[in-house]
Amino acid sequence: VKEQSVRRGNFLMFFSNGYRFRKYMKAILIGLPTWFVIGILINQSDRFAKVMYGSTTLDSGRSIMFAYVAISIGDILVGFVCQWLKSRKKGLLIFYILCVVSAFLFFSPLNSNDSVMYAICALLGFSTGFWAIFVTMGAEQFGTNLRATAATTIPNMVRGSLPLMNLLFLTLFQKSWGWPLIKSGILTGIIVMLISSVAYYYTEETYHKDLNYTE
């Protein structure tokens, strides 16, 4: 790359070409469920617990702790899963399914006390352990001269999407439309998963991709 007359690490290159921009957006959108789970379900688990089963003792800080311990385990395991399946997309799909199942349990009648809530938050955390693979997939969408820039900016774009999710969850659904907490959480989750699933479908498989090229 140093010997070639190509621009290196230029963030604006993601927006100067339609095909490259679409790849960049898809790489961001496949990671949205992570921050819906962490930023809304787990971070506000004390609010959900109070509405769902009347708890005033649940500590959202403990929910976050259990979730991040499980995320660490998921981050390690997803790499082995993708290696075994010889596919990044199949590994990501498995964790997407786990995420949907965990969210279903979160909103189900089974979530009826603090101990169960903590366990479900841990399961939600584990299911979002695809963070490592989603970042890897995003970086591998691009040539050598943009790969590091993609790997560092894509996760930050996903983190930055949380205020947009809160615009739906809190500002629009609850404050403007007067929806209850549970209904707002479920519909926000459905919208996020639908967007990510469409992006996933159109995202290129990178497991066997030759990465020796530049943009």
Specify the residue positions occupied by each region the protein language model found.
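Intracellular juxtamembrane helix-capping segments at the cytosolic ends
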Residues: G129-F142
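C-terminal ends and interior cores of transmembrane alpha-helices
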Residues: I97-N111
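Cytoplasmic membrane-interface "Motif A"-like loop-to-helix N-cap segments
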Residues: W84-Y96
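Hydrophobic core of transmembrane alpha-helices in multi-pass small-molecule transporters
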Residues: S115-G129
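A membrane-interface helix-boundary motif in multi-pass transporters
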Residues: R88, Q174-I191
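Helix-to-loop junctions at the C-terminal end of transmembrane segments
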Residues: G74-S87
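A late C-terminal transmembrane helix in Major Facilitator Superfamily
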Residues: A139-K175
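Extracytoplasmic gate region of multi-pass secondary transporters
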Residues: R20-S72, L162-N166
